[in-house]
Amino acid sequence: MVARNQVAADNAISPAAEPRRRSEPSSSSSSSSPAAPVRPRPCPAVPAPAPGDTHFRTFRSHSDYRRITRTSALLDACGFYWGPLSVHGAHERLRAEPVGTFLVRDSRQRNCFFALSVKMASGPTSIRVHFQAGRFHLDGSRETFDCLFELLEHYVAAPRRMLGAPLRQRRVRPLQELCRQRIVAAVGRENLARIPLNPVLRDYLSSFPFQI
């Protein structure tokens, strides 16, 4: 009896605790109340770019746009285009190379697309490549060219040999690239269409018709 009365006493609810239990809201009543709708927060407005806030200036004509687009595609295929390489990075890569070694990279100047970095006798230097009136020329030179690679070929073949061999990202070139270069050098890019080849090989030759 004593044990049973003790258990009953332990399980009994004290009068002081009863009002507290009655005052606590039940979970069923709180869950039945409708939830407040979630309103999406408005996205902050993105400010429009100010005129001239890009790296390159606006193209003057659609022909200029096509020429730069074509030049970019040729640069991607040439192997010595180093993209957004800095001036310091370009000079460090050229420092131990022979005189005349060069590479093409993006210019950091707002009014130029590309820059030419070359190892001179006095050390590496960089020259801006200007694009004006649909033609390319080096900074400080009056000689202009329809194509950036014609400009490079001109300075490679010049008597003073300002440019030598390009610094390629891959030192070992694929055999098909070497064959294409020799064919272009042998017959000239103006005669590539006359070579009796299937369309696939002819397209490959014309995809980079330069001797560099």
Swiss-Prot record:
Changing R60A: No effect on LIF signal transduction suppression. It is found in: Nucleus; Cytoplasmic vesicle. Residues 56-67 are annotated as: Kinase inhibitory region (KIR). GO terms for biological process: cell surface receptor signaling pathway via JAK-STAT; cellular response to amino acid stimulus; cellular response to cytokine stimulus; cytokine-mediated signaling pathway; fat cell differentiation; intracellular signal transduction; macrophage differentiation; negative regulation of CD8-positive, alpha-beta T cell differentiation. GO terms for molecular function: insulin-like growth factor receptor binding; kinase inhibitor activity; protein kinase binding. Induction: By a subset of cytokines including those belonging to the interferon, interleukin and colony-stimulating factor families. The gene is Socs1. The keyword Nucleus applies. Its main location: nucleus. Residues 1-55 are annotated as: Disordered. Residues 68-79 are annotated as: Extended SH2 subdomain (ESS). Residues 174-183 are annotated as: Interaction with Elongin BC complex. It comes from Mus musculus (Mouse). Residues 25-36 have a biased composition (Low complexity). This is Suppressor of cytokine signaling 1. Pathway: Protein modification; protein ubiquitination. Changing Y65A: Some loss of JAK signal transduction signaling. Reduced binding to JH1. Changing F56 to E/S: Reduced binding to JH1. Keywords: Cytoplasmic vesicle, Growth regulation, Nucleus, SH2 domain, Signal transduction inhibitor, Ubl conjugation pathway. High expression in thymus. Lower expression in lung and spleen. Expressed in both Th1 and Th2 cells. Essential negative regulator of type I and type II interferon (IFN) signaling, as well as that of other cytokines, including IL2, IL4, IL6 and leukemia inhibitory factor (LIF). Downregulates cytokine signaling by inhibiting the JAK/STAT signaling pathway. Acts by binding to JAK proteins and to IFNGR1 and inhibiting their kinase activity. In vitro, suppresses Tec protein-tyrosine activity. Regulates IFN-gamma (IFNG)-mediated sensory neuron survival. The ESS and SH2 domains are required for JAK phosphotyrosine binding. Further interaction with the KIR domain is necessary for signal and kinase inhibition. The SOCS box domain mediates the interaction with the Elongin BC complex, an adapter module in different E3 ubiquitin ligase complexes. The Elongin BC complex binding domain is also known as BC-box with the consensus [APST]-L-x(3)-C-x(3)-[AILV] and is part of the SOCS box. Disruption phenotype: Mice exhibit lymphocyte deficiency and degeneration of the liver parenchyma. Animals die within 3 weeks of age. Mutants show a much higher frequency of CD8 single positive thymocytes. Changing S61E: No effect on JAK signal transduction suppression. Residues 162-211 form the SOCS box domain.
